[in-house]
Amino acid sequence: MSQNQEFSKKEIYNLNKLQKRLRRNVGEAIADFNMIEDGDRIMVCLSGGKDSYTMLEILRNLQQSAPISFSLVAVNLDQKQPGFPEHILPEYLEKLGVEYKIVEENTYGIVKEKIPEGKTTCSLCSRLRRGILYRTATELGATKIALGHHRDDILQTLFLNMFYGGKMKGMPPKLMSDDGKHIVIRPLAYCREKDIQRFADAKAFPIIPCNLCGSQPNLQRQVIADMLRDWDKRYPGRIETMFSAMQNVVPSHLCDTNLFDFKGIKHGFEVINGGDLAFDREELPLQPAGWQPEDDENQLDELRLNVVEVK
C-alpha cells in the first residue's frame, strides 16, 4: 500500500513539474509576442486532440494567476464526420464550467464531393474550417483566436516550405487574418510535442481521433515529422537549436535581396552585423543553443561540433 502511495506521489510530482514547464513555455510565448492583452476574449479552438486540450488547460491555469483579465470561450467545429462522438466535448466542457459553443457545419460532405476518393482532403478542409472559425469569432465577439500548434508543428512547416516550396517560411506564433479582422495566436509555440503528449496522457483527456474523415495522411509532413524525431533521438539539442535559429535570423548572411541590400555594399559601407565569415570558420558553442536536458536523463558529454560535420 505504501509503495502504491509513494508511486502516486511521484506521479503527482512529475505532473506538477510538467505542468509548470508548459505554463512557463506558454507564458513566455504570450509575453514575447504580446498574444493576450487586458480585456481580451480568447476563442480557444478545441478539436478534441491532445494539443487543444492542453492549450485550454494551460490557459485556464494562467487565467487564475495572470496580472491581466481575459476570458475564454471554447469552440468546436462539428464537421459531421461519420462516427464523430458529439457528446464528448460538451460533457467535458460543462464539467469544467467553461463557456463553449459547438458549431455544426457539414464540411465533410462538401470535401467528399470535391476531392476524389483516396486523396488528401486536409487543404480544402482547413480553408473551409478557417472561414467558419473567423465567422464564429465575430459572432462571439472574440478579440483573439487561439490555435493549438506547438513548436514541432512550426519546425515541420519550416522544413516543408524549404524542401517542397522553396521558401524559408514557418508558422507564425501570431498573425493577422487576410481580411485584417482577426488576430490568430498560437500559445503553445514554445511547447514541445513530447511534453504535450505526456501531459495529455497524465490528464487522461477524452481524445477524439483525428482521422474520422478518412483522409489519407499528408505524406510530405509525415516524412518531415519522422526526420525531426530521428534527429531529436540521435542528436539531442538539435531541435532546440533549429527553433532558436528561427528567432535569430541574420538577413545579411542569407541570399534574399528583398531582405538585405547586397547591391548597396560598397567601399566605406558600414560593417555588417554578424562578422566577416568569408575566410574564417565560424566557432560553434560547446552545447547546442537552447537545449535543456530531460529531467530524467543524465547530462550528456559536451561535444564541439564543426559546421561541416553536422549531417
Curated annotation (Swiss-Prot):
- What's its EC? 2.8.1.-
Part of which pathway? Answer: tRNA modification
Keywords noted in UniProt? 4Fe-4S, ATP-binding, Cytoplasm, Iron, Iron-sulfur, Magnesium, Metal-binding, Nucleotide-binding, RNA-binding, Transferase, tRNA processing, tRNA-binding
User: Where is the motif named PP-loop motif mapped on this chain?
Assistant: 47-52
What does it catalyze? cytidine(32) in tRNA + S-sulfanyl-L-cysteinyl-[cysteine desulfurase] + AH2 + ATP = 2-thiocytidine(32) in tRNA + L-cysteinyl-[cysteine desulfurase] + A + AMP + diphosphate + H(+)
A GO BP entry is:
tRNA thio-modification
Cofactor annotation comment = Binds 1 [4Fe-4S] cluster per subunit. The cluster is chelated by three Cys residues, the fourth Fe has a free coordination site that may bind a sulfur atom transferred from the persulfide of IscS.
Q: What Pfam families is this protein classified in?
A: ATP_bind_3 (PF01171)
Q: What class of enzyme is it?
A: transferase
- MF (Gene Ontology): 4 iron, 4 sulfur cluster binding; ATP binding; magnesium ion binding; sulfurtransferase activity; tRNA binding
Q: Which cofactor does it need?
A: Mg(2+); [4Fe-4S] cluster
Matching HAMAP family: TtcA
Q: What's this protein's family per the entry?
A: Belongs to the TtcA family.
Per UniProt, subunit arrangement is:
Homodimer.
Q: What else is known?
A: The thiolation reaction likely consists of two steps: a first activation step by ATP to form an adenylated intermediate of the target base of tRNA, and a second nucleophilic substitution step of the sulfur (S) atom supplied by the hydrosulfide attached to the Fe-S cluster.
Q: What does this protein do?
A: Catalyzes the ATP-dependent 2-thiolation of cytidine in position 32 of tRNA, to form 2-thiocytidine (s(2)C32). The sulfur atoms are provided by the cysteine/cysteine desulfurase (IscS) system.
What is the designated name of this protein? tRNA-cytidine(32) 2-sulfurtransferase
| Organism (species) | Escherichia fergusonii (strain ATCC 35469 / DSM 13698 / CCUG 18766 / IAM 14443 / JCM 21226 / LMG 7866 / NBRC 102419 / NCTC 12128 / CDC 0568-73)
